[in-house]
């Protein structure tokens, strides 16, 4: 954990509203080469994804580009940040971010945030389907997320649908059955990007559609 998260290193749009930041490394059975075995790297975000998501959630619009309003969905909210990715060195791949899914979703991520006062838990991450199975799989991860939502029925859990959306027939609608497993949970809200064509704006870097 990092108790100085509201220091000068926090983006100005989120400054003063970070209640807690925790780096979570997932299962104790993680590979031996993982640099993160010893603990927590605090609020550092070398990748930028966490900062981007936090700004979308509660950024106050500070430092927005001229002509654009970068205010997040809930600019008055407090943030309890939980990181599931780890920056480390792999003997074969070099330095990179790796993600480890929670071993116990309820007790590892949902319950700590809930106990700290969070009532909306947004997750802009997910895992691939079980090997050999298609997207849209409802698996054990989906089940335990549903169980957590049932146990904490005043906690709204959100999950990103994933980055694998396709529009094979180019009809302007994303094809069905392309969700990550976490987003198939029944008691949560799954979130996906729209496919609106906005040629005067830059595309997101993760877009598989080219716009």
Q: Language-model segments: what does each one mean?
A:
Residues 1-102, 116-119, 128-133, 151-156, ...:
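Subtilisin-like serine protease catalytic core
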Residues 130-139, 171:
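Glycine/threonine-rich flexible loop motifs
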Residues 66-69, 170-179:
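Short beta-alpha junctions and helix-cap segments that line functional grooves
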Residues 145, 162:
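Active-site glycine-centered loops adjacent to acidic/histidine catalytic or metal-binding residues
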Residues 112-113, 148, 182:
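Generic structural signal for hydrophobic
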Residues 199-211:
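Noncatalytic luminal/extracellular "stalk/propeptide" segments of secretory-pathway proteins
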Residues 107-116:
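Short, well-structured alpha-helical segments in soluble
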């Amino acid at each position: 954990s990092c108790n100085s998260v509201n220091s000068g290193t926090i983006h100005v749009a989120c400054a003063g509203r970070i209640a807690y930041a925790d780096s979570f490394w997932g299962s104790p059975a993680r590979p031996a080469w993982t640099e993160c075995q010893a603990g927590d790297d605090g609020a550092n975000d070398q990748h930028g994804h966490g900062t981007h998501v936090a700004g979308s959630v509660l950024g106050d619009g500070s430092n927005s580009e001229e002509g654009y309003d970068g205010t997040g969905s809930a600019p008055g909210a407090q943030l309890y940040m939980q990181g599931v990715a780890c920056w480390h060195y792999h003997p074969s791949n070099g330095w990179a971010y790796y993600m480890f899914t929670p071993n116990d979703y309820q007790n590892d991520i949902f319950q700590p945030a809930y106990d700290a006062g969070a009532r909306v838990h947004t997750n802009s991450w997910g895992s691939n389907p079980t090997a050999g199975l298609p997207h849209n799989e409802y698996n054990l991860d989906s089940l335990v997320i549903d169980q957590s939502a049932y146990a904490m029925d005043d906690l709204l859990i959100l999950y990103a649908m994933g980055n694998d959306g396709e529009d094979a027939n180019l009809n302007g609608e994303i094809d069905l059955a392309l969700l990550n497993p976490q987003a198939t949970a029944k008691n949560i809200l799954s979130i996906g990007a729209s496919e609106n064509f906005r040629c005067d704006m830059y595309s997101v870097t993760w877009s598989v559609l080219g716009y």
